[in-house]
Amino acid sequence: MKLLMLAALLLFCFEGNASDAYEIPRSVVIELKEQPSNRIYPVFIQLPASYASQTDRVYPVIYLTDAHYSFPLVSGATRFPMNSGVMQQAIIVAVSYEQGSKGASSRVRDYTPSKAKAWQQETGNAKGHMAFIRDTVFPFIEQNYRGSNTNRTFVGNSLGGLFGAYMLFTEPELFSNYILGSPSVWFDNNMILAVSAVKPRAATRVYISVGEYETPAYGEGEDMVIGASWLRDKVQAIDSGNIKLRFSVVAGASHATAFPTSAIQGLDWIYGVKKQ
């Protein structure tokens, strides 16, 4: 009888808490409208742990693509390093896909720099999406939060990495740092490699990372490792002394699994607090 009562009590406790949802601490979701398309984009924002107590402090801002995937991942991976003082605290901002759209169609359209005839989906809105980030997202964050306009980091993966490379080559001063995970250099016959690149005038850090197994030999449709190395070479070619570049191959990682390591190691390289 006691065992039955205990089991019933445990079941009651479980059912009583089953509807409680977990929320990322100090986070909100807002909506911003892109002009002139009038598309609405949800934007996820997380403030650092010290934000409420250090009211005069201006924070670096980490900007992410693919918000539903990247926001919980980067928030979780940076929580302990930031809170324990081994990584600078920062505001995390993730731009999601167009409201009401399928994520795949939104990201393919917004993260690609050219209109690819071979694709059935709409492509080629990278310039427009870059303008949305520059003219709408940045002002909102910097006017409503204590986010730095001189210490911004971009983090993108796959097509998001391609989008970051496009911004690096066309408007490099938008961000101080670029983390390009498994960039889709192959898109539209490697067209990103033919983009006429603007040399950064300010100090810029570029972290390019790719999984060891992102090759056809391991089932990938494209050789992402070679593509990432070609992108590295292009970045080196435009460096006039302002670029600090790091290239990393994530051991044992595929396209599906490389990004968590790429993101946290890239952020540690940029914001890690080194012991003296």
What are these regions (language model features)?
Residues 30, 57-132, 136, 140-144:
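Serine-hydrolase catalytic machinery in alpha/beta-hydrolase-like enzymes
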Residues 146-157, 178:
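Alpha/beta-hydrolase fold nucleophile elbow
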Residues 4-12:
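Sec-dependent N-terminal signal peptides
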Residues 174-185:
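A conserved short beta-strand
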